[in-house]
C-alpha cells in the first residue's frame, strides 16, 4: 500500500493524475492474520490524501489530480461516504470556534485592565464584576478553561493583548489544509443489484474482504440516502455505475473496469493510461471563419 503512494507521487510530480479502486483493502472491523483488527480502509486513504496534498502537479500551482473509488459493498463504505462531510464540519468548527475564542479572550483581557479595583483585585473575578461577566460569557461559548486562565495570567504579567489565530472558509486556507479528504475526487461504485435493492426497499450486505462473509446488513435506501445527503452537503461522493460501465466495455475478455481517471471521463483496464490530446480548431477555419468539418 505504501508503495502506491510513492508511485502516485512520481506521477503527480510530472503532471499526471491517478484513479484507484481501494475496495480490496479490508475493513476496520476485519481481523488480521497475526491477531487484532485492521486499521481499516480510511486510515490508508488519509495517508494517500495527505501525500497528494503535499505535491504540486507537474511543478505548477495545481494540486495533484486523484480519484478514489470504493465499491458500495465495502464494510467501510458508510465512513467513506461521510468522509468529506465530517471533515468540512471540522472546518466550520475551526472557523466559528477560532473567532469565538478570539472574541471572548480579547474581552477577558480587556476586563482585566479596564477595572475600577486596584492591584491583584483586577484579576480576581470575585472582586472584578466585569471580569466575572466575561468569564461566564466565555464559558457559555465553550471557550476552554485553560485558555481563559492563560489570558488572566498574561494580563497579570502586563500584557495588553493576546494573539489567537482565526480561520476562514477559503478552499485554500489553513482550515482546509488542516483536515483530510480535500485532495481527491471520491466516488462510490454501484451495481444494478444495489440500485434494484434501493428501488425495491431491500436489505444490502456489506462484505468482508478477507473471507467474503457478510460484515453488516443495512437497508439499501438508507445507504442511498447517505450518499444523497453527502453529495448535497459537500459534492462528494460521485457515483460510478459499475454494471453499466462494464456493459459498454470494449475489451471485456481482458478484465473488469473498476475505476476511472480523476475526471472520470476515461474508464478502462487496471494499470492503463489516459493519454489526452487536443486539437487547435482555429486551424480548421476557412477565410469566412467557418469550420471545415467534411
Describe the predicted segments one by one.
Residues 1-33, 41-44, 55-58, 227-294:
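Function-dense linear segments that define catalytic or interfacial modules
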Residues 25-26, 34-47, 60-64, 69-237, ...:
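Conserved, charged catalytic cores of large soluble enzymes
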Amino acid at each position: 500500500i505504501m508503495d502506491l503512494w510513492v508511485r502516485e507521487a512520481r506521477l503527480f510530480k510530472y503532471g499526471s493524475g491517478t484513479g484507484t479502486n481501494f475496495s480490496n483493502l479490508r475493513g476496520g472491523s476485519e481481523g488480521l492474520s497475526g491477531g487484532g483488527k485492521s486499521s481499516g480502509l480510511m486510515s490508508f486513504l488519509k495517508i494517500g490524501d495527505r501525500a497528494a496534498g503535499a505535491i504540486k502537479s507537474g511543478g505548477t500551482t495545481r494540486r495533484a489530480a486523484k480519484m478514489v473509488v470504493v465499491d458500495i459493498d465495502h464494510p467501510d463504505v458508510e465512513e467513506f461516504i461521510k468522509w468529506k462531510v465530517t471533515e468540512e464540519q471540522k472546518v466550520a468548527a475551526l472557523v466559528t470556534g477560532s473567532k469565538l475564542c478570539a472574541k471572548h479572550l480579547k474581552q477577558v483581557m480587556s476586563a482585566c485592565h479596564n477595572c475600577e479595583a486596584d492591584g491583584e483585585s483586577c484579576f480576581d473575578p470575585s472582586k472584578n464584576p466585569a471580569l466575572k461577566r466575561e468569564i461566564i460569557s466565555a464559558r457559555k461559548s465553550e471557550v476552554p478553561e485553560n485558555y481563559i486562565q492563560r489570558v488572566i495570567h498574561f494580563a497579570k504579567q502586563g500584557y495588553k493583548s493576546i494573539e489567537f489565530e482565526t480561520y476562514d472558509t477559503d478552499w485554500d486556507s489553513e482550515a482546509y489544509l488542516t483536515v483530510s479528504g480535500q485532495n481527491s475526487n471520491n466516488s462510490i461504485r454501484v451495481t444494478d443489484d444495489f440500485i434494484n435493492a434501493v428501488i425495491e426497499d431491500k436489505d444490502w450486505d456489506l462484505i468482508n474482504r478477507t473471507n467474503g462473509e457478510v460484515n453488516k446488513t443495512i437497508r439499501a435506501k438508507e445507504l442511498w440516502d447517505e450518499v444523497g445527503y453527502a453529495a448535497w452537503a459537500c459534492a462528494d461522493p460521485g457515483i460510478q455505475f459499475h454494471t453499466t460501465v462494464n456493459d459498454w466495455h470494449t475489451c471485456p475478455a481482458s478484465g473488469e473496469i473498476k475505476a476511472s481517471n480523476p475526471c472520470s471521463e476515461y474508464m478502462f483496464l487496471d494499470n492503463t493510461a489516459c493519454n489526452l490530446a487536443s486539437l487547435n480548431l482555429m486551424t480548421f477555419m476557412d477565410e469566412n471563419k467557418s469550420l471545415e468539418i467534411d
